[in-house]
Amino acid sequence: MKQSEFRRWLEAQGVEVSNGTNHLKLRYQGKRSIMPRHPSQEIKEPLRKAIIKQLGL
């Protein structure tokens, strides 16, 4: 899954996404996580699972 697709999926789940310097800040119901900002690259499965776990989705 590309990072841009994952970002759209997160936004559909209600995650608030804001831009950091070299990354995206993710917020969901008081929980926070970060994601690198490389929209055309594939996001590795362990990172995707970690973000989902950190946000409690």
Swiss-Prot record:
Its EC number is 3.1.-.-. It comes from the Bacteria. Keywords: Endonuclease, Hydrolase, Nuclease, RNA-binding, Stress response, Toxin-antitoxin system. Pfam families: HicA_toxin. Signal peptide: none annotated. The keyword RNA-binding applies. GO terms for molecular function: endonuclease activity; mRNA binding. Probably forms a complex with the cognate antitoxin HicB 1 which inhibits the mRNA interferase activity. Toxic component of a type II toxin-antitoxin (TA) system. A probable translation-independent mRNA interferase. Belongs to the HicA mRNA interferase family. This is Probable mRNA interferase HicA 1. It comes from Photorhabdus laumondii subsp. laumondii (strain DSM 15139 / CIP 105565 / TT01) (Photorhabdus luminescens subsp. laumondii). The lineage of its organism: Bacteria, Pseudomonadati, Pseudomonadota, Gammaproteobacteria, Enterobacterales.
